[in-house]
Amino acid sequence: MMILVLHGPNLNLLGWREPEVYGTTTLEDVNALCAATAAELGLQVECHQSNHEGHLIDKIHAYGRLHREGQALGAVFNPGALTHTSIALHDAIKGTGLPVVEVHLTKIGRAHV
């Protein structure tokens, strides 16, 4: 069974972008932890990062289809900067029926204060 881990815009900069806010853990470190945890649970994981909203939507659509076919459990998604602005991502998640857990590295609403 598969799980998608989806990272939004600028998360490729983890580890060196504002380390006082986001820490020094890199995106590669996060993906390695996800892969190791998935393996322990007997799951497959695909980690994908994009700075482009359309690419994120395409992944959600693809995994929505896999979920309907019984091949994917769902997704863990950090939409990054798109958290407060993307109606299209919301519609993609809602429209596909893909179970999605939204996660964040900081308290949303406070990161840009």
PLM features: what roles do these ranges have?
Residues 1-4:
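Extreme N-terminal starter segment of soluble prokaryotic enzymes
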Residues 9-11, 80-83, 106-108:
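Short glycine-rich anion-binding loops that position phosphate/pyrophosphate groups of nucleotides
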Residues 20-39:
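Short catalytic helix/loop segments, enriched in acidic residues and glycine
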Residues 44-54:
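Short beta->alpha junction loops
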Residues 55-59:
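Short acidic active-site motifs
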Residues 63-75:
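Short acidic/histidine-rich motifs immediately flanking catalytic phosphotransfer sites
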Residues 111-113:
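Conserved small/polar residues in nucleotide/adenosyl-binding loops
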